[in-house]
């Protein structure tokens, strides 16, 4: 196969991988943790992924401890944990 053909094949495979629907197995495990507001005195609106509804929901974070299912905004939560119907795969957040 020519180098042009290989490049075309690589491009098609990459496109296919991006458009393939996501299964819950591709979601990071911390997305399944419950919201953990912690018991400190801060009042920080945050978002967590709710696996029962496949949605990111707001909660109030106390500012200490907690777990990794804690995002500063809804967009970050969605990008990391929500299985999109459009086939965009979630990614592991780098906190």
Swiss-Prot record:
The keyword Nucleus does not apply. Residues 65-67 are annotated as: Responsible for the anti-cancer effect. Residues 92-95 form a propeptide. Expressed by the venom gland. It is found in: Secreted. Disulfide bonds join 31-81, 40-64, 56-77. GO terms for molecular function: serine-type endopeptidase inhibitor activity. GO terms for cellular component: extracellular space. SMART domains: KU (SM00131). Keywords: Disulfide bond, Protease inhibitor, Pyrrolidone carboxylic acid, Secreted, Serine protease inhibitor, Signal. The record marks 41-42 as: Reactive bond. Its main location: secreted. InterPro entries: Kunitz_BPTI, Kunitz_BPTI_sf, Prtase_inh_Kunz-CS, TFPI/VKTCI-like. It holds the Pfam family Kunitz_BPTI. Residues 31-81 form the BPTI/Kunitz inhibitor domain. Residues 1-24 form the signal peptide. The modification Pyrrolidone carboxylic acid is found at residue 25. Serine protease inhibitor that inhibits trypsin. Exhibits an anti-tumor effect and displays integrin inhibitory activity without being cytotoxic. Is able to dose-dependently inhibit the adhesion, migration and invasion of human glioblastoma U87 cells. Also impairs the function of alpha-v/beta-3 (ITGAV/ITGB3) and to a lesser extent, the activity of alpha-v/beta-6 (ITGAV/ITGB6), alpha-v/beta-5 (ITGAV/ITGB5), alpha-1/beta-1 (ITGA1/ITGB1) and alpha-5/beta-1 (ITGA5/ITGB1) integrins. Negative results: does not inhibit chymotrypsin. Belongs to the venom Kunitz-type family. Monomer. PANTHER family: BPTI_KUNITZ INHIBITOR DOMAIN-CONTAINING PROTEIN, KUNITZ-TYPE PROTEASE INHIBITOR-RELATED. This is Kunitz-type serine protease inhibitor PIVL. It comes from Macrovipera lebetina transmediterranea (Blunt-nosed viper). The lineage of its organism: Eukaryota, Metazoa, Chordata, Craniata, Vertebrata.
